[in-house]
Regions:
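Active-site pre-lysine segment of PLP-dependent enzymes
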Residues: 9, 25-37, 50-105
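PLP-dependent aminotransferase-like
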Residues: 1-44
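Active-site donor-binding loop signature of nucleotide-sugar glycosyltransferases
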Residues: 20-22, 46, 101, 120
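Conserved residues at the C-terminal ends of beta-strands
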Residues: 45, 79, 117
C-alpha cells in the first residue's frame, strides 16, 4: 500500500521497497537481506493491496521470527479473505502489530477510523505518542452504530464475496483475458 511510503517520506523516514516474488508473494530472503541494524519495522499488506492475494502464513511467521523489529500487518481487506486474521498470533509474536480499518468491509471510509492490535507493551508506547482527542465525536458515534449493527455488516461481506466469485467467472469467460489471479480482497 503506497501511502505508507508517502507518510514515511513526510516524516523524513527512509524506506526500502522489496519487490514481491512471482504470484505476488513475499521474498523472505530478499526482505531479510534488505534489513540492517537501523531497520525498525517491516510493513506487510495481507491481503495485499493492490494484488488482492493473501501472503503465505509461513513466510510472515518467518519474518516475525527472524526480524529483530516490529512486523506490521495491514489487514484492511481481511474480512473478505478465506483465512482469518493474524490477531490470534499476537501472544506468540511480541513484535507483531496488526492494523484494520472501518473503510473496506465495514464500508465507512469517510470516518477515517482504524484499529491497532498489538501486545500490551506496544499499545502502551503507542498511547504515549498518539495525539490527544485523536478520534472525533462524530466518528465515535458512527463507529458505535456500525458495531451495534454488526450482523448487517456480516451479511454485506458475504454478498461482496459472492459477487467477487461471479466477477471472476465472468472474467474467465472473456477470451482475451489470459489469466485471472485469485483474490482474497
Amino acid at each position: 500500500y503506497g501511502m505508507y511510503e508517502v507518510l514515511a517520506n513526510l516524516n523524513d523516514i527512509k524506506t526500502v521497497n522489496v519487490p514481491l516474488k512471482e504470484r505476488f508473494q513475499i521474498d523472505v530472503k530478499s526482505v531479510l537481506s534488505a534489513v540492517n541494524f537501523n531497520t525498525k519495522l517491516i510493513f506487510i499488506c495481507s491481503p495485499n493491496n493492490p494484488s488482492g492475494n493473501l501472503l503465505q502464513i509461513n513466510d510472515i511467521k518467518t519474518l516475525m521470527d527472524e526480524f529483530n523489529g516490529l512486523v506490521i500487518i495491514d489487514e484492511a481487506y481481511i474480512d473478505f479473505a478465506p483465512n482469518s486474521s493474524f490477531i490470534s498470533e499476537l501472544n506468540d509474536f511480541p513484535n507483531l502489530i496488526i492494523t484494520q480499518t472501518f473503510s473496506k468491509a465495514l464500508a465507512h471510509a469517510g470516518i477515517r477510523l482504524g484499529m491497532c492490535f498489538a501486545s500490551e507493551r506496544i499499545i502502551s508506547v503507542l498511547n504515549k505518542i498518539k495525539p490527544p482527542y485523536n478520534v472525533n465525536q462524530m466518528t465515535q458515534k458512527k463507529a458505535l452504530e456500525v458495531v451495534q449493527n454488526f450482523d448487517t455488516y456480516l451479511v454485506q461481506v458475504e454478498i461482496v464475496k459472492s459477487e467477487r466469485e461471479i466477477l471472476v467467472e465472468e472474467f474467465n469467460n472473456i477470451n482475451w483475458i489470459e489469466h485471472v489471479f485469485p483474490s482474497a480482497s
